[in-house]
């Protein structure tokens, strides 16, 4: 960086703490975090960027408490919200790191490992600030405007949070066979590798991809009834992936109707 930019973070929890550490590591001047003892009207003074890392429900209130500046960029880390929630700040923006940050330390490491970021900004100046963050962290970015923000974040929840829920189901079903979840994690990693190498449709394997409905029926007979609703929903979701692949669509046997 030719110019050392400065940032003040409001709400240094896991995400805010991770951003603070990652930005400090790459040479940004990270000012003291903001807590309740700080006059909120002074948060945006003498700083290039104010980064709001509070829960989504508090972002608008925090932004309104900060005195607007003609030079300071005010941004938030929410994936579901766009820059409009930061009105009346002229240089408002949203930057969402598309990674999981269970702790500040782990998050800081992941932010510097070719992380993807979803960006949106109200002005060229605020977009330039966001792009400098991505560039300095060695990341990659794409723009998601206000109207598509919820779609984007729903996909992120499916790709991350829902995977954890799926593995929770796998863990419970595996326990009935006396098998630990750790035995399945290499399978999970191999599946992610297949998706990266081949794309979603061509990465798919297993009984639904083969049209092996007898095996699906054996699964349904074996697993605990409390898991059936999720299992059936996933079978149908898997069928949709198969149906979207022109290579398999013509040869896939139809699923028998339930009697």
Q: What are these regions, as identified by a protein language model?
A:
Residues 3-6, 71, 114:
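Phosphate-coordination loops involved in phosphoryl transfer and adenosine-cofactor binding
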Residues 182-259:
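NAD(P)-dependent Rossmann-like dehydrogenase/reductase catalytic/cofactor-binding core
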């Amino acid at each position: 960086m030719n110019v050392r930019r400065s940032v003040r973070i409001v709400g240094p929890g896991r995400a805010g703490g991770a951003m603070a550490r990652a930005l400090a590591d790459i040479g940004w001047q990270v000012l003291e975090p903001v807590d309740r003892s700080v006059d909120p009207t002074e948060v945006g003074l003498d700083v290039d960027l104010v980064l709001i890392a509070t829960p989504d429900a508090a972002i608008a209130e925090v932004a309104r408490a900060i005195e607007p500046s003609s030079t300071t960029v005010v941004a938030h880390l929410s994936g579901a919200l766009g820059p409009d929630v930061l009105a009346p700040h002229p240089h408002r923006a949203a930057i969402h790191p598309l990674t999981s940050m269970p702790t500040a330390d782990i998050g800081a490491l992941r932010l510097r490992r070719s992380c993807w970021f979803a960006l949106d900004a109200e002005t060229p100046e605020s977009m330039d600030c966001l792009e400098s963050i991505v560039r300095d962290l060695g990341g990659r970015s794409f723009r998601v405007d206000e109207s598509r923000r919820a779609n984007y974040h729903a996909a992120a929840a499916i790709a991350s949070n829902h995977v954890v829920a799926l593995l929770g189901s796998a863990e419970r079903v595996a326990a009935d066979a006396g098998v630990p979840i750790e035995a399945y994690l290499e399978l999970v990693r191999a599946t992610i590798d297949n998706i990266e190498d081949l794309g979603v449709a061509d990465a798919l394997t297993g009984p639904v991809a083969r049209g092996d409905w007898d095996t699906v029926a054996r699964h349904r007979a074996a697993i605990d009834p409390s898991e059936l609703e999720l299992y059936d929903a996933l079978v149908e979701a898997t069928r949709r992936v198969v149906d979207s692949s022109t290579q398999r669509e013509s040869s896939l046997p139809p699923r028998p109707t339930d009697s």
